[in-house]
Regions:
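Short, charged recognition helix plus adjacent turn
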Residues: 2-15, 71, 81-98
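Residue-level signal for the short linker/turn that defines the boundary of a DNA-recognition helix
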Residues: 23, 33-34, 46, 61-64
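Residue-level detection of the helix-turn-helix DNA-binding "recognition helix"
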Residues: 30, 44, 56-58, 85
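Short alpha-helical DNA-recognition segment
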Residues: 32-53
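DNA major-groove recognition helix of helix-turn-helix
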Residues: 54-55, 65
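DNA major-groove recognition helix of helix-turn-helix/homeodomain DNA-binding modules
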Residues: 64-79
Length: 98
């Protein structure tokens, strides 16, 4: 049997906890002493709205934005996300992306 992240089979699609992932993004940003405004400017956004939505667990960043955040925060993109089976959550959130 092939296994990927954790004990999930490699061919199984991972599900991420949107609220816990947002909290992780906020915690890492704060640990790095980076302001929301600095993230906005780095990303080339006109407002902070997207950053606040990600951190509030309203939606996930698009793949290119997730990679840019990871570069800014000096972590891997996977370090910004928390799998659902690692927290007690029953909601599936695929489709919420901004």
């Amino acid at each position: 049997m092939l296994y990927g992240i954790g004990r999930r089979r490699m061919m199984e699609r991972p599900h991420f906890d949107i609220v816990a992932s947002g909290a992780r993004m906020r915690a890492i940003r704060q640990e790095r002493k980076i302001s929301v405004k600095q993230v906005m400017e780095y990303m080339g956004f006109e407002s902070t709205q997207a950053v606040y939505k990600w951190e509030a667990g309203k939606c996930f960043p698009q793949a290119d934005n997730l990679i840019a955040l990871a570069i800014l925060y000096r972590v891997s993109p996977m370090e910004l996300l928390i799998e659902e089976d690692l927290v007690s959550s029953s909601s599936h959130i695929w489709g919420n992306v901004a």
